[in-house]
Amino acid sequence: MKNVLIIGGGQMGKIIAKDLSNDYYVQVADRNPNVADIVFDVAQANKVEIKELFDKFDLIIGALPSKLGFKPLLHAVENGSDYVDLSFMENDPSGLFDVARKNKSIVFHDCGLSPGLSNLIAGKLNATYNPTYITIMVGGISQDPNTPYGHINTWCVEDLQEEYTRPARFILNGKERLVSPLNSRFWSKHRFDNIDELEGFMSDGLRSLLKLKGPDVLSEITLRHKGHLTSVRKLIGNNTFVKMIKEKCPTKKDMVVMRIECDDATITMIDKQQ
Protein backbone atom coordinates (compact mmCIF):
# COMPACT_ATOMS: atom_id res chain seq x y z
CA MET A 1 0.00 0.00 0.00
CA LYS A 2 1.37 3.41 -1.00
CA ASN A 3 2.22 5.94 1.70
CA VAL A 4 0.56 9.36 1.33
CA LEU A 5 1.33 12.46 3.38
CA ILE A 6 -1.15 15.32 3.56
CA ILE A 7 0.36 18.64 4.61
CA GLY A 8 -2.42 20.51 6.40
CA GLY A 9 -5.25 19.03 8.43
CA GLY A 10 -7.80 21.77 7.90
CA GLN A 11 -11.15 21.61 6.13
CA MET A 12 -9.67 20.38 2.86
CA GLY A 13 -6.98 18.14 4.30
CA LYS A 14 -9.27 16.15 6.58
CA ILE A 15 -11.71 15.37 3.73
CA ILE A 16 -8.87 14.28 1.45
CA ALA A 17 -7.51 12.02 4.19
CA LYS A 18 -10.90 10.41 4.67
CA ASP A 19 -11.37 9.86 0.92
CA LEU A 20 -7.94 8.27 0.43
CA SER A 21 -7.73 6.20 3.61
CA ASN A 22 -9.46 3.13 2.14
CA ASP A 23 -6.86 2.70 -0.59
CA TYR A 24 -3.67 4.22 0.83
CA TYR A 25 -1.79 4.52 4.08
CA VAL A 26 -2.48 8.17 4.88
CA GLN A 27 -0.95 10.44 7.49
CA VAL A 28 -1.67 14.11 8.12
CA ALA A 29 1.06 16.56 9.12
CA ASP A 30 -0.06 19.74 10.84
CA ARG A 31 1.18 22.03 13.58
CA ASN A 32 -2.09 21.43 15.46
CA PRO A 33 -1.79 18.16 17.42
CA ASN A 34 -5.59 17.85 17.55
CA VAL A 35 -5.78 17.15 13.80
CA ALA A 36 -2.32 15.72 13.09
CA ASP A 37 -0.85 12.25 12.93
CA ILE A 38 2.52 13.98 12.67
CA VAL A 39 2.95 17.29 14.49
CA PHE A 40 4.94 19.36 12.01
CA ASP A 41 5.06 23.11 11.37
CA VAL A 42 6.10 23.48 7.74
CA ALA A 43 6.39 27.25 8.08
CA GLN A 44 9.12 26.87 10.71
CA ALA A 45 10.80 23.71 9.39
CA ASN A 46 14.11 23.86 7.54
CA LYS A 47 15.09 22.10 4.33
CA VAL A 48 16.66 19.10 6.09
CA GLU A 49 13.61 18.54 8.30
CA ILE A 50 11.24 18.72 5.33
CA LYS A 51 13.37 16.30 3.30
CA GLU A 52 13.51 13.85 6.20
CA LEU A 53 9.71 13.87 6.40
CA PHE A 54 9.02 13.75 2.65
CA ASP A 55 11.43 10.84 2.07
CA LYS A 56 9.11 8.56 4.07
CA PHE A 57 6.22 8.92 1.61
CA ASP A 58 5.40 8.03 -1.99
CA LEU A 59 3.19 11.08 -2.52
CA ILE A 60 2.79 14.43 -0.80
CA ILE A 61 -0.46 16.41 -0.96
CA GLY A 62 -0.36 20.10 -0.10
CA ALA A 63 -3.59 21.32 1.52
CA LEU A 64 -2.25 24.48 3.11
CA PRO A 65 -3.38 28.11 3.07
CA SER A 66 -2.05 30.01 0.07
CA LYS A 67 0.63 31.91 1.99
CA LEU A 68 2.19 28.60 3.10
CA GLY A 69 1.75 26.58 -0.09
CA PHE A 70 4.87 27.42 -2.06
CA LYS A 71 7.55 26.42 0.46
CA PRO A 72 6.73 22.68 0.67
CA LEU A 73 6.13 22.55 -3.08
CA LEU A 74 9.59 24.03 -3.69
CA HIS A 75 11.24 21.55 -1.33
CA ALA A 76 9.36 18.63 -2.88
CA VAL A 77 10.64 19.57 -6.33
CA GLU A 78 14.21 20.00 -5.09
CA ASN A 79 13.96 16.67 -3.26
CA GLY A 80 12.52 14.74 -6.21
CA SER A 81 9.27 14.01 -4.36
CA ASP A 82 5.93 13.64 -6.14
CA TYR A 83 3.52 16.37 -5.10
CA VAL A 84 -0.12 17.40 -5.59
CA ASP A 85 -1.07 20.89 -4.43
CA LEU A 86 -4.47 22.46 -3.72
CA SER A 87 -3.45 25.80 -2.24
CA PHE A 88 -4.50 29.02 -3.96
CA MET A 89 -0.91 30.30 -3.86
CA GLU A 90 -0.05 33.58 -5.56
CA ASN A 91 3.29 32.17 -6.77
CA ASP A 92 3.53 30.69 -10.26
CA PRO A 93 4.76 27.08 -9.84
CA SER A 94 5.59 26.79 -13.55
CA GLY A 95 8.94 28.41 -12.77
CA LEU A 96 9.93 25.14 -11.07
CA PHE A 97 9.28 22.92 -14.09
CA ASP A 98 12.94 22.62 -15.16
CA VAL A 99 14.04 21.69 -11.64
CA ALA A 100 11.20 19.17 -11.40
CA ARG A 101 12.25 17.52 -14.67
CA LYS A 102 15.87 17.38 -13.55
CA ASN A 103 14.97 15.75 -10.23
CA LYS A 104 12.22 13.53 -11.73
CA SER A 105 9.60 15.10 -9.50
CA ILE A 106 6.01 14.77 -10.74
CA VAL A 107 3.97 17.81 -9.70
CA PHE A 108 0.31 18.66 -10.17
CA HIS A 109 -0.50 22.14 -8.90
CA ASP A 110 -3.83 23.99 -8.63
CA CYS A 111 -5.70 20.71 -8.15
CA GLY A 112 -8.89 21.93 -6.54
CA LEU A 113 -12.35 22.47 -7.96
CA SER A 114 -11.41 25.68 -9.75
CA PRO A 115 -8.61 25.94 -10.60
CA GLY A 116 -8.38 22.19 -11.07
CA LEU A 117 -11.40 20.30 -12.37
CA SER A 118 -12.52 23.37 -14.29
CA ASN A 119 -9.15 23.58 -16.06
CA LEU A 120 -9.33 19.94 -17.13
CA ILE A 121 -12.78 20.46 -18.63
CA ALA A 122 -11.73 23.69 -20.35
CA GLY A 123 -8.66 21.97 -21.78
CA LYS A 124 -10.81 19.15 -23.15
CA LEU A 125 -13.23 21.63 -24.74
CA ASN A 126 -10.31 23.44 -26.33
CA ALA A 127 -8.84 20.23 -27.76
CA THR A 128 -12.22 19.05 -29.04
CA TYR A 129 -13.79 22.20 -30.48
CA ASN A 130 -10.92 24.64 -31.11
CA PRO A 131 -13.09 27.48 -29.75
CA THR A 132 -12.56 31.24 -29.93
CA TYR A 133 -13.65 31.68 -26.31
CA ILE A 134 -13.98 29.69 -23.08
CA THR A 135 -15.80 30.99 -20.02
CA ILE A 136 -15.62 29.21 -16.66
CA MET A 137 -18.43 29.99 -14.20
CA VAL A 138 -18.17 28.29 -10.83
CA GLY A 139 -19.10 28.83 -7.21
CA GLY A 140 -19.39 27.05 -3.90
CA ILE A 141 -22.47 28.57 -2.26
CA SER A 142 -25.07 27.87 0.39
CA GLN A 143 -28.08 25.81 -0.65
CA ASP A 144 -30.12 28.41 1.24
CA PRO A 145 -29.72 31.86 -0.35
CA ASN A 146 -30.90 33.45 2.92
CA THR A 147 -27.80 32.25 4.78
CA PRO A 148 -25.72 35.30 5.82
CA TYR A 149 -23.87 36.46 2.70
CA GLY A 150 -25.23 33.34 0.99
CA HIS A 151 -22.02 31.61 1.99
CA ILE A 152 -20.92 28.43 3.77
CA ASN A 153 -17.41 28.05 5.21
CA THR A 154 -15.74 25.11 3.48
CA TRP A 155 -12.12 26.31 3.22
CA CYS A 156 -9.65 28.85 4.57
CA VAL A 157 -11.44 32.20 5.01
CA GLU A 158 -8.20 34.15 4.58
CA ASP A 159 -7.77 32.52 1.17
CA LEU A 160 -11.42 33.16 0.35
CA GLN A 161 -10.72 36.86 0.88
CA GLU A 162 -7.98 36.61 -1.75
CA GLU A 163 -10.62 35.81 -4.36
CA TYR A 164 -11.95 39.34 -3.90
CA THR A 165 -8.66 41.20 -3.48
CA ARG A 166 -6.20 39.48 -5.82
CA PRO A 167 -6.26 41.02 -9.33
CA ALA A 168 -7.98 38.66 -11.75
CA ARG A 169 -6.08 37.69 -14.89
CA PHE A 170 -8.02 36.96 -18.06
CA ILE A 171 -7.39 36.77 -21.79
CA LEU A 172 -8.96 39.28 -24.20
CA ASN A 173 -8.04 39.42 -27.88
CA GLY A 174 -5.29 36.91 -27.15
CA LYS A 175 -3.59 39.12 -24.55
CA GLU A 176 -3.43 38.83 -20.77
CA ARG A 177 -5.34 41.54 -18.91
CA LEU A 178 -6.00 42.42 -15.26
CA VAL A 179 -9.16 43.53 -13.48
CA SER A 180 -10.15 44.08 -9.87
CA PRO A 181 -12.70 41.43 -8.80
CA LEU A 182 -14.70 44.05 -6.91
CA ASN A 183 -15.00 46.38 -9.91
CA SER A 184 -18.77 46.31 -10.38
CA ARG A 185 -18.43 47.14 -14.09
CA PHE A 186 -17.40 43.52 -14.60
CA TRP A 187 -20.06 41.90 -12.42
CA SER A 188 -22.58 39.70 -14.21
CA LYS A 189 -25.88 37.84 -13.72
CA HIS A 190 -26.42 34.12 -14.29
CA ARG A 191 -29.34 31.70 -14.23
CA PHE A 192 -29.42 27.95 -13.58
CA ASP A 193 -32.42 25.65 -13.44
CA ASN A 194 -34.11 25.57 -10.01
CA ILE A 195 -31.65 28.08 -8.49
CA ASP A 196 -32.34 31.73 -7.72
CA GLU A 197 -30.51 34.25 -9.88
CA LEU A 198 -26.77 34.32 -9.18
CA GLU A 199 -24.22 37.07 -9.64
CA GLY A 200 -20.65 36.67 -10.78
CA PHE A 201 -17.30 38.43 -10.58
CA MET A 202 -14.05 37.83 -12.41
CA SER A 203 -11.51 35.90 -10.34
CA ASP A 204 -7.91 34.76 -10.72
CA GLY A 205 -8.52 31.06 -11.31
CA LEU A 206 -7.33 30.51 -14.87
CA ARG A 207 -3.78 29.78 -13.74
CA SER A 208 -2.28 27.31 -16.26
CA LEU A 209 -5.01 28.17 -18.79
CA LEU A 210 -3.38 31.57 -19.24
CA LYS A 211 -0.85 29.75 -21.44
CA LEU A 212 -3.51 27.84 -23.39
CA LYS A 213 -3.11 28.21 -27.14
CA GLY A 214 -6.22 28.82 -29.21
CA PRO A 215 -8.99 30.90 -27.60
CA ASP A 216 -8.87 34.67 -27.98
CA VAL A 217 -11.02 35.12 -24.89
CA LEU A 218 -10.62 33.23 -21.59
CA SER A 219 -12.11 34.12 -18.22
CA GLU A 220 -13.13 32.66 -14.88
CA ILE A 221 -16.23 34.00 -13.15
CA THR A 222 -16.93 33.09 -9.53
CA LEU A 223 -20.63 32.71 -8.75
CA ARG A 224 -22.40 33.95 -5.63
CA HIS A 225 -25.97 34.52 -4.44
CA LYS A 226 -27.58 37.82 -5.41
CA GLY A 227 -26.50 40.72 -3.18
CA HIS A 228 -23.34 38.99 -1.97
CA LEU A 229 -20.87 41.20 -3.81
CA THR A 230 -22.19 44.53 -2.55
CA SER A 231 -22.03 43.24 1.03
CA VAL A 232 -18.56 41.77 0.61
CA ARG A 233 -17.18 44.95 -0.91
CA LYS A 234 -18.21 46.77 2.27
CA LEU A 235 -16.57 44.11 4.46
CA ILE A 236 -13.34 44.30 2.47
CA GLY A 237 -13.45 48.09 2.64
CA ASN A 238 -13.71 48.22 6.43
CA ASN A 239 -11.35 45.26 6.96
CA THR A 240 -13.93 43.04 8.67
CA PHE A 241 -14.34 40.33 6.00
CA VAL A 242 -12.50 37.50 7.78
CA LYS A 243 -14.11 38.25 11.15
CA MET A 244 -17.67 38.48 9.81
CA ILE A 245 -17.48 35.44 7.52
CA LYS A 246 -16.10 33.30 10.35
CA GLU A 247 -18.74 34.54 12.79
CA LYS A 248 -21.83 34.74 10.60
CA CYS A 249 -21.51 31.99 7.99
CA PRO A 250 -22.68 28.66 9.40
CA THR A 251 -21.53 25.16 8.61
CA LYS A 252 -24.61 24.01 6.73
CA LYS A 253 -25.26 22.30 3.42
CA ASP A 254 -23.47 23.84 0.47
CA MET A 255 -23.56 23.21 -3.26
CA VAL A 256 -21.27 23.57 -6.23
CA VAL A 257 -22.60 25.31 -9.31
CA MET A 258 -20.40 25.09 -12.41
CA ARG A 259 -20.86 25.94 -16.05
CA ILE A 260 -18.06 25.93 -18.62
CA GLU A 261 -18.96 27.10 -22.09
CA CYS A 262 -17.33 27.74 -25.44
CA ASP A 263 -18.56 28.45 -28.96
CA ASP A 264 -20.02 25.00 -29.58
CA ALA A 265 -20.51 23.35 -26.18
CA THR A 266 -21.70 23.94 -22.63
CA ILE A 267 -20.92 21.74 -19.62
CA THR A 268 -23.08 22.28 -16.52
CA MET A 269 -22.72 20.65 -13.10
CA ILE A 270 -24.79 21.23 -9.97
CA ASP A 271 -23.70 19.17 -6.97
CA LYS A 272 -25.66 19.55 -3.73
CA GLN A 273 -24.39 18.24 -0.41
CA GLN A 274 -26.76 15.60 0.93
What do these predicted regions represent?
Residues 79-82, 103-105:
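A short helix->loop->beta-strand "cap" motif at the edges of active sites that frequently abuts
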Residues 12:
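Hydrophobic/small residue at the entry helix of a nucleotide-binding pocket
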Residues 87-109:
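Rossmann-fold NAD(P)-binding glycine/threonine-rich loop
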Residues 43-56:
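Conserved Rossmann-fold cofactor-binding substructure of NAD(P)-dependent oxidoreductases
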Residues 4-8:
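Conserved N-terminal Rossmann-fold NAD(P)-binding element of oxidoreductases
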Residues 127-274:
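C-terminal catalytic/substrate-binding lobe primarily of soluble NAD(P)-dependent oxidoreductases
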